[in-house]
């Protein structure tokens, strides 16, 4: 079994790089993401379903967004870093309208979310022997105060705190979570209660939670108001949605 692939940060370069060994759960997470347009993605109703959605701001076409997602899937499977992915999308003329800093943000957010989902799956599989999670912030000059306030929080894997505060907790968030055994949690000190700090606006969800049912319900509600023929065609899309585990 492949365990944990590393997601590393070079703080002085503000870069994300992933190791070449594929982390299977992260790959599967990326493949399950669904294409939505930017105005849908940033709708307030999407807060709890954003983990299963993928979009790219400033790119309006579904086919264009799909090309970006496909390229990111390949990058995660191969362990490509940002520079390699950027060169590939340039060669394939994908996302050419986006400046470099936007491309890096797209890459970083997608990779972080995929690995967060993969780690969540791993933590759930092993919570009998490692029943606690510890929040870790980088704690340098670029760490947001709200993120730093969560540093060192140690709570059970299934504590409600992790449903809204599992990293990434904002754009370019460098925070991580690590699993602990009972002995390790005892040494670190289990938190009596969750801190009052909150993630950045729009990031209050756990990327690893399966929200397929909620997303399907939301889209069905939208489809219900469409004309007959369009409604029938749109309904067929639901057959492609993954079911809950």
Predicted regions and their residues:
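Domain-core detector
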Residues: 1-170, 179-245
């Amino acid at each position: 079994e492949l365990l944990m692939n590393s997601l590393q940060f070079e703080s002085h370069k503000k870069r994300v790089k992933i190791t070449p060994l594929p982390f299977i759960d992260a790959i599967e997470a990326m493949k399950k993401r669904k294409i939505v347009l930017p105005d849908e993605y940033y709708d307030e109703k999407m807060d709890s379903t954003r983990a299963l959605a993928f979009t790219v701001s400033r790119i309006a076409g579904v086919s264009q967004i799909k090309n970006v997602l496909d390229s990111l899937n390949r990058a995660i499977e191969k362990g490509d870093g940002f520079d390699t992915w950027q060169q590939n999308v340039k060669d394939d003329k994908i996302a050419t309208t986006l400046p470099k800093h936007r491309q890096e943000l797209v890459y970083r957010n997608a990779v972080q979310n995929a690995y967060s989902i993969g780690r969540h799956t791993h933590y759930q599989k092993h919570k009998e022997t490692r029943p606690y999670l510890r929040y870790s912030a980088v704690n340098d000059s670029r760490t947001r105060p709200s993120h730093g306030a969560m540093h060192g929080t140690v709570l059970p894997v299934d504590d409600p705190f992790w449903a809204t505060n599992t990293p990434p907790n904002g754009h370019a968030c460098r925070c991580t979570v690590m699993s602990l055994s009972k002995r390790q949690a005892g040494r670190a000190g289990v938190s009596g209660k969750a801190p009052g700090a909150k993630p950045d606006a729009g990031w209050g969800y756990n990327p690893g939670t399966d929200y397929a049912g909620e997303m399907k319900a939301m889209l069905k509600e939208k489809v219900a108001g469409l004309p007959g023929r369009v409604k029938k065609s749109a309904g067929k899309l639901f057959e492609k949605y993954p079911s809950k585990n």
